């Protein structure tokens, strides 16, 4: 059963990790997929080729979502190429970790701009389309760190907490237009970034999780498929952890 057949989806920051898996799952479930990448050009181009094997329309865009004019241009281009837009997954994000006393203003600003401002930029631009259509689903990627904080990640935690407050507000503002806004909060998920860590460190983290394992990108992507589908039509303004019971 394909849950997203006939829907047009945008996934930001989809060249690798969780974003890439979301793009794959959306195409697998029948969605036409627009996605963005920025620095990982080769991976972005490779993903576009890969997703075409699912038989849906796919196009990648090199775009910096942290810049408002680029976000507006992105939505304009998607409308020209796909005709409309039903689902937005705001996934673009970075980390620049460091203790508060060692954190530079630049590292604070970079993380807030890319992680939080990009969500505002893309959501504002895309909401015009959804308001006109009187339907739509925003799926915004936060983190368990945005709920509970984490030493050495004040900038990242602040950006992810901001996404939660923003998303709940948008759910209240746009609910009357049949537009939903939900938050996914991943915990410890196995990606390319975790693959380079010491296996003993990874195992130590996993043992602190009630399910005693790291999550997989599939775990996050499957939830996003549900939130983008009509099966979640009465769910909005929620923060849903994918964390094996960490929270």
Predicted feature locations:
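Active-site helix of classical SDR
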Residues: 123, 159, 167
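Conserved glycine-rich Rossmann-like NAD(P)H-binding loop of the short-chain dehydrogenase/reductase
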Residues: 29-46
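Substrate-binding pocket helix/loop in short-chain dehydrogenase/reductase
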Residues: 99-100, 107-112, 205
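C-terminal substrate-recognition "lid" of short-chain dehydrogenase/reductases
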Residues: 179, 213-242
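Alpha-helical segment proximal to the catalytic Tyr-Lys
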Residues: 128, 172-176, 233
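Residue(s) in the substrate-gating loop at a strand-loop-helix junction
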Residues: 143
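Conserved glycine-rich cofactor-binding loop
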Residues: 8, 15-17
């Amino acid at each position: 059963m394909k849950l997203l057949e006939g829907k047009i989806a945008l996934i930001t920051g989809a060249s690798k990790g969780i974003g890439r898996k979301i793009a794959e799952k959306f195409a697998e479930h029948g969605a036409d997929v627009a996605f963005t990448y920025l620095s990982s050009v080769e991976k972005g181009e490779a993903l576009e080729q890969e997703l075409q094997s699912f038989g849906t329309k796919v196009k990648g865009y090199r775009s910096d979502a942290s810049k408002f004019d680029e976000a507006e241009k992105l939505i304009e281009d998607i409308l020209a190429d796909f005709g409309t837009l039903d689902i937005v997954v705001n996934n673009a994000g970075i980390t620049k970790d460091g203790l508060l006393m060692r954190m530079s203003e630049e590292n604070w600003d970079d993380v807030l701009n890319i992680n939080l401002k990009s969500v505002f930029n893309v959501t504002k631009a895309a909401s015009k389309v959804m308001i006109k259509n009187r339907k739509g689903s925003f799926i915004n990627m936060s983190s368990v760190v945005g709920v509970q904080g984490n030493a050495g990640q004040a900038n990242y935690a602040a950006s992810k907490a901001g996404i939660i407050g923003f998303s709940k507000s948008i759910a209240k503002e746009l609910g009357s237009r049949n537009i939903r806004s939900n938050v996914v909060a991943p915990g410890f998920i196995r990606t390319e970034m975790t693959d380079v860590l010491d296996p003993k460190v990874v195992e130590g983290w996993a043992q602190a999780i009630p399910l005693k394992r790291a999550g997989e990108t599939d775990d996050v992507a499957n939830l996003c498929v549900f939130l983008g589908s009509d099966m979640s039509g009465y769910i909005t303004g929620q923060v849903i952890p994918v964390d094996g019971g960490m929270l």
